[in-house]
Amino acid sequence: MILNWARQLVCIMNIALISAAMSFCVDASAQNIEDDSLKASVEAEFILDSTQLYVIDELVVVGYGVSRKSVLTGANSSLSAVQSENSNVESALQGRIAGLNVWMSEGGEMGEAEVTVRGGTSITGNNAPLYIVDGFPVDNISNLPVSDILRIEVMKDAAACAIYGARAAGGVIIVTTKKARGDGLETSYKSQYGFSTFKNKLKVLSPYNYAKFCYETAAMKSEETLESFTSVYGSYDELAKYQSVEQNDWVDQLFGENGFFMNQSLLMKYKKDKTAYKISYDYNDNNGILVGQNSRRHNFGMNINHEVSKYLSFDLNTSYYNKIQNGAGVSTEGSNTDARLRNALLYSPLNIKDVEDFESVSSTYNPIAVNNADYRKQTQNGVRGDLGVTITPVSFFDFKSQIGVNGMFRETDRCYGVGTSQALKNGNAPMASILNLRQSTFRNSNTANFYPLKKLKRHSLSLLVGEEFIKKKESYNQSESRYFPEYLNAEQCLANMSLGAPQPSNSAVLPNDVIMSYFGRAKYSYDDKYIFSATYRADRSSKFASDKQWGHFPSLSAAWRISEEDYLKYLQVISDAKLRYSIGATGNNRVSSNLFQQIYTSPSDADGVLEIDGEYLSYLKTGEYKPNPDLTWETTVSRNIGLDLGFLNNRFQLIFDIYRNTTEDLLLQTKLPYSSGYTYMMQNVGSTENKGVELSLSVGVVNRKNFKFDVDFNIAFTDTKIKSLGGVDKMEMSSGWAGSEITGDYILEVGESVGRMYGYETDGWYTVDDFEYEDGTYILKEGIVSDATLLAGNIRPGSLRLKDQNGDGTIDESDKVVIGNALPKHTGGLQLKFQLWNFDLAAYFYWKYGGDVYNANKIENTTTNKYSYRNMSADVEGCWTYLNGEGGIASPEEMAQINANATMWSPIMARYVFHSWAVEDGSFLRLQQLTLGYTLPSKWTDKIKLSKVRVYASANNLFCWTKYSGFDPEVSVRRATSATPSVDYSAYPRSTAFAFGLDVDF
């Protein structure tokens, strides 16, 4: 498979190279460097003549240092200009770098980004990369303001990542924020206003079709049920009156608002003599399309760099953010009561006041009422500070010591009012809870660099040794009170918890997570032509037993700069040609602490407290995880071959990589039998293999004085296989969206990929000819496969029919097969940038080809289950019907004639079933961003003492070309583990955003 991918990409490379060469032959204009951010971030080497200025080499940030890009031996990718039009860092990265996948779990402010480098290697573990911000490791970068980011480096292979050892199996993303470099004062101000709208809606039954469907459902249950229905809505002949009833669009009411957002940022940089500082402020205000959903965030940042002498300097970085989120979102992880979107699709479009016990018989709840009754406010504060001191006693040696802290405090206030699932469990009385979470990280790092061959002309040797200590602390406290008076609002309940019935508090101080590390790197280069590098890191983690704590992670890499050979050195068309190879190991220890020893916990509610003589007494119980003293690191060995090519002074650049990763000792959560007294056990079992091909192209197609056209393209092919599951051949996993009705809807199997969907194959529906009809009862003919056991009821003409895979005549668990795969065949991005005089236009696309989506909404919205009065998807308008023209149950002959043109089975069934009809192709091409800008001429800005003024208009998520029938193909909720991806169930819909902005440099 790898060879096939390589052949395809070679063809693409040849075509692109020929096309670019033809373009360069007719366009040899100069490329002027005007990117202030590049000048500020890294130093660059230039070659100059009277008319041309080309970037030949640049410094890029690597682990614990910097390196010239030309002598890198690892698979590193850089993004030097993050679009200021984006307010979210993760969305700015989507599709920009080959092999870096950024998928949003859902839309809205509460949607989480799933970031993986080269697809990830763990099955039930964490595949997220390690984030480093200005040298400090952080859990995520979602709270970083885009306006403060200067450069992002993505490290993919072991040559680049092994220096970070135990935390780098998922890759490393290094973020460098803006600093002051040039002399004097520089000030920039950015302002953006915009709005978002919800444009893609799912159709449900009209009031008339809904009334007819409810009538049929009632008629099929019993005469009593039908009589109850007709007493409220009328007889069959009277249902025609609902044709004139206006559609009550619950989705439109819930998501019908235009969301408004605003972003303001101010950046000041100043340098004089040997002191430089930067101060930044960013404010983001976002009101989502969901009623009551909004967020606000303040960011402050400061950097001071002072050179005391040529021997001593220090660097101080500090940042603070405050973020407030209001609204509970769509609650995809909660009960059906709280799933806003689910209720908006299923809730009755007609008046229900006269329907007895409507919410119970329909299992639906008024989405607006529940949304208003479910109060959530989350306040999060984060602070980070680190101080670095660098001592350079001689030119070939330096020592740097860094000490830093990172803290986060988050308070989540919840109040569940009347009608929410939590209130219904307690007599429909309001309840409130306050959860306080505290996290802190202390880090100390000491590194020494030695350059023993610095004065030699052709030989270069750099040595790095270092040690690092990281200590993380975490604690939480949750207080809860129930049975508040209904007249109290959410704020009053939370401010007066004693007015309810206080419950036993739930608090814990989690075990410290400590990593102690020693590392080193040696890099040798001969004549900048032959480069060799070796790294080694030893990590000791407190998450494992004392004899399992140490992990060792070496790497070796080499590069041959072919372009520096004499026979190519003077070919002006080739500006760079480098062949790279690397092999090495990284680790993953992202599991909870103390899984290796017995843990006791205190129950968090009254149901788990002993009652003795009317008094509640707390007690301890064993945790849900059985201790495993043999637990240790998950280790990934990475192999990478890469080729870097540059032509015509790097106006055409190509990066091509082939890689193969193998992961052993997978940290796998295994389920234990009930008799063990535990639920799970974390074990080192199994292995995976991850291989793929990546291609990146950057072409300056046209580069004239008043017109420029640049193209950036990347594509990545990834194939992941399970090599072992620790002695078993397969293992079923559950997404859990339907509770216990649908289990084992994903399967892990040796020799296959992760993300395979496991269910039944749709085989149409039963017809009248499949049955004998005796005394009003349908009896399945001999030899016809029966779904009755699976569907939890008698089958009849029109019932869903599933394929009998083993030929035993009965549909059961043994007939489940793989019906989908969430893993895409390839992903990529395309950016087109134009500049015409002072106008600039940028169009940015990204795509996913292949990869199925598990459309759980489709199952629920076309199945009555055991309930009544549910609205259904418009897909059922052509379904099988049991009624004749007079509203009575049709005879077999009438039924066959009426349903001759039916388009699907009857949705009247007693349970949900996961079958292939609900698995859809999730391929898409998205126009993620379209921006048109205009920069005022300098002759205008000079008069008002401004360096630069640019105005722009942009649109995000403007178009998405896909065959997927749901709201959006880029969705993945119910992600309990990496083994159950791409489930679409009641996810927050993605909106289209339009923004107008102003950028001013003083």
Region locations from a protein language model:
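Short, small/polar-rich motifs associated with maturation and membrane association
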Residues: 2-301, 306-308, 313-315, 319-321, ...
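Conserved C-terminal beta-signal and adjacent last beta-strands/turns
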Residues: 710, 821-849, 914-961, 987-1002
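Surface-exposed loop/interface segments of Gram-negative outer-membrane beta-barrel transport/assembly proteins
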Residues: 182-248, 288-382, 400-516, 564-637, ...
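Extended, hydrophobic alpha-helical segments in both membrane/secreted and soluble proteins
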Residues: 149, 300-302, 401, 444, ...
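Residues on the lipid-exposed face of transmembrane beta-strands in outer-membrane beta-barrel proteins
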Residues: 177, 266-270, 302-306, 385-391, ...
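Short secondary-structure subsegments characteristic of cysteine-rich extracellular domains
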Residues: 295-307, 549-559, 947-959
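Transmembrane beta-strand segments that form the barrel wall of outer-membrane beta-barrel proteins
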Residues: 191, 281-287, 532-541, 583
